[in-house]
Amino acid sequence: MPSARLTGLSGSQIALRDDDLALAFQNPAHLNSAMHNALTYNQNFLLGGIKSGYFGYGYHLDKIKITFQTGVQFITYGTFKQADELGNVNGEFKASEYAFTLGAGRQINERLSAGINLKYIASQLEAYRSTGLVADLSGAYWHEEKKFGAAVVFRNIGAQLSSYEGNGYTGKKEDLPLDIQIGFTKKLKKAPFRLSALLHDLNRWDMRYDNPLDNETSLLGEAPSEPSKLSQELNNFFRHLSVGGELIFGKTEVVRVRIGYSHQVRKELNISNVRSFSGFSLGVGFKVNRFRVDYGMGRQHLAGGTTHLSISTNFSEFRKK
């Protein structure tokens, strides 16, 4: 996730629309004039000392009514011991990946907008390197009076330019993880609460996998019962769904408290017969002077989870008297 706000909401809530530049990394159709001179920095602390982050800047050209963004997303895996096939350590190596983004979004009419993100991706694992060029295409609908939004994103349309195999550009190319997403968001009329939902990976409907634990016999030697067809279909459907909610304080949303849930994360990483918060996420955000600070925490497994910190501002605010 590019920001702590989205981490707290359990994922890429692509229908959300305001002046948060990090939202445009997930859906460039939300790029708007309020993001002119916006700056965002996001740091994600993952398991095993792995770190990732996103840095972005927005700029609006009023003459052509287009808002642009540029940014870089990174993930560093740390330092590894380098050993031969016999286990003899003969050095160290590092691994990291970067995605350089250039995006643009435009308002088509009062409620419809469209956008595109172009990304150059570079990966380095020891002496092996791979690059790719992808695009995210998106469209969005926003009804200001009803505070309702809907969006669709076609993510990772493109190709691998060079692979880890062979001589880079001549090696075998891999397929990119295409992801078609649909999202919705609604702020309640008489309550300071906003609900968001995302359907992801719609291009690969069956997201179930064979879990060997499902085939284990009980202590009494009884074979496990086969789930019904309806149960399997419902389980698969909810794996595509992630939901999040924001409790809002103040007219300018000075404070936001968040909660989210991902059924896919819970089903794939939760330990059977053990109670845990796998799949749940929490977050809080508040505005201090000209800065907005957000914190998000996602629980993936009993072994731990992720924490996310974001700081954003707008240079235009510093020019106001």
Where would I find each of the regions flagged by the language model?
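Subset of outer-membrane beta-barrel
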Residues: 1-321
